[in-house]
Design a protein with these regions (language model features):
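An active-site-proximal structural segment forming one wall of the substrate-binding cleft
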Residues: 1-24, 59
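Glycan-recognition surfaces
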Residues: 1-2, 6, 46-144
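Active-site-proximal loop/short-helix segments
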Residues: 17-46, 74-84
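Short, polar/charged, Gly/Pro-enriched helix-capping and turn/loop motifs at alpha-helix termini
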Residues: 18, 66, 166-169
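Charged, low-complexity, helix-prone segments enriched in Lys/Glu/Asp/Gln
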Residues: 44-51, 82-86, 152-166
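Glycan-recognition and catalytic regions of carbohydrate-active enzymes
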Residues: 117, 139-180
Length: 180
């Protein structure tokens, strides 16, 4: 861990990097289980998570103005401790142009985690608005039928207009039920 911290910190300093994004796009559970001793199930995962927190703490101490973008690995790294250190600008790998799923993520996360984002794939109002949150990745294809550059510009302007409201109080239009 000490070597990694020093190496990455020096690399970032030498190259003027002030925004760090972490993603690993694998399911590590099987690797963790294989590394565990029979009577110590879960210890490798615990050590990994403790190491992750220590690594990010080192980066934030060395670079106090650094932004850590926690690509949440399919939502698996959205926990209290990572939220203290980072923002998930890509909150989940569930992003395959399915607007109802986007709305469910936004609805639930906005109660606890105001900074998060996902991708916008289409410029029609329903799909695009379903993707909006405090951050959004425009994943448009200029060559896709039914999408024009003008429509893309309109979406971006609409997003710029409403984005400040994502940092205000959150009152969903549907019931919240019991959050405990």
């Amino acid at each position: 861990l000490k070597w990694l911290c020093q190496y990455m910190g020096d690399f970032m300093e030498q190259n003027g990097i002030d925004h760090y994004r972490q993603d690993f796009n694998i399911d590590p559970l099987e690797f963790w289980h294989q590394a565990d001793e029979a009577n110590r199930r879960g210890i490798t995962e615990v050590k990994y998570i403790e190491g992750l927190y220590a690594y990010w703490d080192y980066l934030l101490q060395r670079f106090p103005n650094m932004i850590i973008d926690n690509c949440a690995s399919g939502g698996r790294r959205l926990d209290y401790e990572t939220s203290l250190r980072s923002a998930p600008l890509w909150r989940t790998d569930y992003q395959y142009s399915e607007p109802m799923g986007y709305q469910c993520h936004t609805y639930g996360l906005n109660f606890f985690l105001p900074q998060h984002g996902t991708g916008a794939y289409y410029v029609d109002r329903f799909d695009f608005r379903s993707s909006m949150s405090s951050a959004v990745v425009f994943n448009w294809k200029f060559t896709q039928t039914g999408q024009s550059f003008l429509d893309m510009q309109k979406c971006i302007e609409e997003y710029k207009e409403v984005r400040p409201y994502y940092y205000e109080d959150y009152y969903p239009l549907s019931g919240i039920g019991n959050l405990t």
